Amino acid sequence: MTVSLCVKLRGLNMYLTKDEERILAGEFGEGTQKALELLVAIGDAYDAERMIPVSRAHAASSGQEGDLYFVELLANGGAKCKVPTSTNPVYDIPYFHKIFANIPENEADVAKRVMDGYRRLGAILSWSCVPYLAENIPLFGETVAFSESSATPYVNSVIGARTNREAAQSALAAGVVGKTPLYGLHIKENRKGTHLVKVSATLKDEFDYTLLGYYVGKQIGYGIPVLTGISARPNTEELINFCAMSNVSGAISMFYMPGLTVEASTVEEAFQDDVPKDEISVTDRELKKAYDELQTASGKIDFVLLGCPHYTLKQLEEVAGLLKGKKIREGVSFWVCTSATARILAERNGYVGIIEGAGGRVVVDTCIDEPCWFAFKDKVGMTDSPKCAYYRRFKDAMVGRLEDCVDAAVKGRRE
Amino acid sequence: MSSREVVLKCHKIIGGYGEGEALVSHEPICFYLTDPKTGIVREKDHELAGKSIADKVLVFPSGKASSVVQIDGLFKLAQHKVAPKALIAKDVETVLVVSAFIVKIPLVDRLEKDAFEVIRTGEFVEVDAEKGIVTIKKQEA
């Protein structure tokens, strides 16, 4: 029998269907073959029994050389995405090269080739790190493969779809084959809460959720926190920030806020009637401590960089509201990164006009961790995203609330 | 001085064959925090700080750091031909599998005996991932 023969040859336990074997034998081209080879290796690492279908994927494309290699391996091998597969931001190449002359040529070439590779693969060219809001939205219970720090926990916890903590390449491979190995968070038992997090801190805005995510991720590291005590329902942006930060300061692929998030309505259900491994509490003091850790300095700034993760329409409205009737100080460069879809609406609603009128820029398709910011290499800036500061593409990036960032941009310095 | 071979079964994750001097790390490794041109570990306070992972059979508990930097880190080492020859790990997760896959370095785990007890830094090790076998050449006085 072909199946058992193949299993024997590979010396492994994972069951593969006839179609999967034909893909591995190269019958559908080298690109798809390589994609499945990677998925099988991952499945073997986790003792997955078999592959399961995914209905969509998000590849955290990055414009780095390792990323480029894999994208071209698949694209040159004739692969096409089998299910909707969205892409992360790289950078808006024509736009930035018009503004900055000094972006290194080789880096620009890598970015160009990465973007072209995804185009050839037939991916959704979203170039957005929050695709789950507009371009590629999973439903409750859907099986997907979403990489990207805010996307993985958001999709698992807020939407209640199922994804593992994917790398860009494993998510792309899943999008190309339309499958992923059955392991990890695709299995209900593995979606059990691990840590009880008792929150009594006041959470008044999006930045407080950034701090909460930072603190929880750092304390727990790897695990599935179950947060209690949050009385007011968090909004989309607050949840995005919590996801992004907890999955950067730690490795949080999923969390529960029983009663607020969809998968478990009670604490007991979130822990699947088991006991928590550990318990932590978050009071105002812990949030302040997190803030103090992130505070880097005050003084003169050269730039403000917002939109990590990409700002939503609501956040663009907030920026416009804060900048209305004001001017950004000469010498300060003010940037907001967002998705192409959010920008279209922000333009229509007049927010882009206000931000640009004040001297700022609203840029699409772009991540703050890209070579396009080369001009700020030796500059000091300010951001509302600790994730942005962590990338270290700048001499220094102070972290503060959006209001403080706008204030610093207008005054030319952080008080 | 005589030599003795210890042959252990292992679990293949990424196939292939690699041999070289063993380098044992009890701490997780971030490939991004090595010098891409020499393979020397640059991470301060790491037990391998200042040592090169180039051409070694690396024995380590797991990878660490974000997927983007980890994968790109190993990729850059391979471009400069200073990547390890084989990887023997304890806790293998998705990012480590992807990293080894794109640079085509054999990756194995689950040796039939604890790798950290059997393998010493400096011993010559052959990793035949295809056959699922790790061979350690023990030097004995």
Name these PLM-found stretches.
Chain A
Residues 1-10:
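Intrinsic disorder/low-complexity segments
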